[in-house]
Amino acid sequence: MKKKFGLAGLVVLMVMLALGAAAEEGNTIIIGCDMYAPYTYKNGTGEFVGVDVDFATEAFGRLGYAVQFREIVWENKQSYLDSGEIDCLWSCFTMSGREDEYTWAGPYLYSRQVAMVRADSDYTELSQLAGKRAAVQASSTAEKALLRRENPNVPEMKQVLCFSTLGEAAAALRKNYVDMVVAHEYAVHSLVDTLPDLYREIPQTLYANELGIAFGKGTHEALAARLQTAIDAMREDGTAKAIVEKYGFDAEKSLGGGN
């Protein structure tokens, strides 16, 4: 009995170690993401595409890894990391304000948070939205920013409604349940470009963000460091610039942090 128990315990330990070291030793990195165009989304054939998909494929490829993107419930992202179902998060994920919560590689891109309103509304400035209703993605930095109001550019809202996805937040705006949606600028650009008769961007910055790749806190430090080296090389050799420009980004601002 003792021998059987010892063997079972050893098997459990080996499985746990394998899960924790999967990213370091395996050939495929499992990346958690949500649908957040133009960063991570699916094309007409159901394949993951986007800035982050191209970035991750190239960066991890230089390290000898293939990548597999997996759509997750974004507000439950921590549980996916803790369980080992995914190796990291790479989906327009903000480092700013979360520096001590994960093991990071990055920043690989810079972004701004902006407001989107209905195309038929009269709003032209952020100040006009004070006392109104806002929609954000749950567990996002936009949610925290609107509720805490630590940035003077952020107006005080009457109500902040949180949704599981940006698409749901945009639908709430379309149905006039809220007065604005706050999200990353190029995600807003994508929605406005796709549905210009429905949405319009307020051309002011609420606050700036740094975007990074998040591994579980205290895990995969060596891999994160190697990934950072690959990202730095992509900046130097022009690959990063080619990727962001492919999706219509301003390379100087997105890669250099300019506003």
Q: Where in the sequence are the language-model features?
A:
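Ligand-binding cleft/hinge of the Venus flytrap
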Residues: 56-65, 142-163, 190-196, 245
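Beta->alpha turn/N-cap motifs
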Residues: 32-37, 70-75, 84-96, 119, ...
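Extended ligand-binding regions for polar small-molecule ligands
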Residues: 53-62, 123, 127-128, 132-133, ...
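Acidic, polar ligand-binding/catalytic clefts
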Residues: 57, 61, 66-128, 199-205
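Periplasmic-binding protein-like
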Residues: 34-35, 110-117, 185, 189-229, ...
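Extracytoplasmic small-molecule ligand-binding "clamshell" domains
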Residues: 24-93, 162, 226, 246
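A conserved helix-loop-strand patch within extracytoplasmic ligand-binding domains
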Residues: 65, 106-158, 218-220
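A ligand-binding cleft/hinge motif common to bilobed small-molecule-binding domains
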Residues: 76-79, 92-101, 145-148, 172-207
